[in-house]
Amino acid sequence: MQMENIEEMPFNHRIWITTNEQIEQVLSYNKNDVMATKLFLDATLGLTEYSQYKGKNKMGLRTALTKKFNVDCHNWPDVRIGEQLMLTLYSRETDQNQWDVRKLRTERSSILLKECVPNWCNIKSKEFNNFLELINKTTVGKDEDFQTSVIFHGIRFDFGLGGTHGCIKPGIYESDKEYVIYDLDVSSLYPSIAKSLGLYPKHLGPDFIKLYGDFIERRIAEKKKPKAERDMVLIEGYKLILNGVYGKSGEETSFMYVLLYTYKTTIGGQLFIAMWAERMVEAVSDLEFLQINTDGITIKLKRTDIDKIKEVCNQLTKETTLEIEDAYYSKMIIRDVNNYISVYEDSTKENEHIKLKGVFVEDVEYHQNSSMKIVPIALKNYFVYNIPIEDTIRNHKNIYDFCLRLKINGSSKGEWHSIEKDNIKITQLTRTTRYFISKKGGGLIVYYNGSNSAGRINKGFNTTLFNRYYKSDNYDINFNFYEVECRKIINMIEDKQLKLF
């Protein structure tokens, strides 16, 4: 949250405070803690400029769901909303006691994957028929995985029980007057497959899918509204509910546990992606696959062929009921399937419309590691606006964006070693340390899990502790360190691209 001070309770909670000095320390900590809580509250209300939370009223979501379904979910974390709402609504719909429903499960020691093939599956190509044959003769145990790969139309499709992935070589790919990067994805893939196939946990019966289908229809209807009219709180809320059901179907502790449901969902998604890719190539033989994801495909093709792909999508929607959304990119910077930048065709520097994934993400959620935000900032400027990384890094004024985070557990010990008047000074670290790489300073050392073996953090570089903010015209930042971090990623993309010629 870029707090000025990062503090922990200065004393163990179980000791008595006996001096005025200790009282002042505790009061200072409490004041900082209240300020942090207020900042986090503002974020949950969407009252922040931080992009991950701006305009996303998470408390409003819970209030809206509470009013609509008469179920108080204000104190539930995101991951519990789907399961808890479904439990309450299902129990209410079927007039059952929640505690009885909680105990329900469908146990199976193994799954014959042939059972998971959708009734609308219509694979034609030799490559994907080999994949289908493998599915039809494979049995997996509840703790086993299923993985295989298929080379189709010049790209490798990697299939696993968790989804489908594929990616072209690292590089920079651009649209022009003749060709365009066309991105397509299935709206709410896993929930939509469940609805398409009428899936429900056997022990819960068909009443389950009625409730589930209602969530799907409401979310899709909301997303179809003009952007200014969409209720993003409801869209995000229904997303949590829908995705939560799929996730919980694979957890033995959940009342929705049934592995056949999980596998029918994922195998159905994989076979849809295979059918989709086949139909695309059949319609436009010279298209180029850029990426394949669990719920979508990104291609490059002639602008004059777009309507042919749209016809393919419309036909597949008729056959499967899965609805497909599309977008156009002017440029993609790809490191791999999980790390890329997509620039939408309507994006401008004044009104950016850019998708950032993996190492290119600038704003992560508060519970994630936001170290070295300057690196993705510089990478975006470099790849999208042709601004040298040195210009971004050396002219950037927000010191927080250069900071890194070190977290250590309770059984480990962290120290900062520096030289003061020709003597080594050892500063004990708290469990969370904020710092940046500097030209002068000290070294970070961690003794893990009570051992005497020390591990050096950012070995070979000096660091400056920054748990407490201070203003300076010259923070003595080691800009070279951050530039090298950027170059590591740039070289993965540009060097490999040059080797293609």
Q: Could you describe each region identified by the protein language model?
A:
Residues 92, 123, 138-141, 218, ...:
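Surface-exposed polar/charged interaction patches
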Residues 11-17, 151-276, 282-283, 300:
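Helical catalytic core of nucleic-acid polymerases
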Residues 22, 125, 200, 231, ...:
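Short, solvent-exposed helix-helix connector turns and helix-capping sites enriched
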Residues 36-39, 244, 275, 318:
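Generic detector of well-ordered secondary structure
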Residues 1-7, 14-188, 192, 271, ...:
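Conserved "right-hand" nucleotidyltransferase catalytic core of DNA-directed polymerases
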Residues 107, 118, 146, 152, ...:
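C-terminal, non-catalytic extensions of nucleic-acid polymerases
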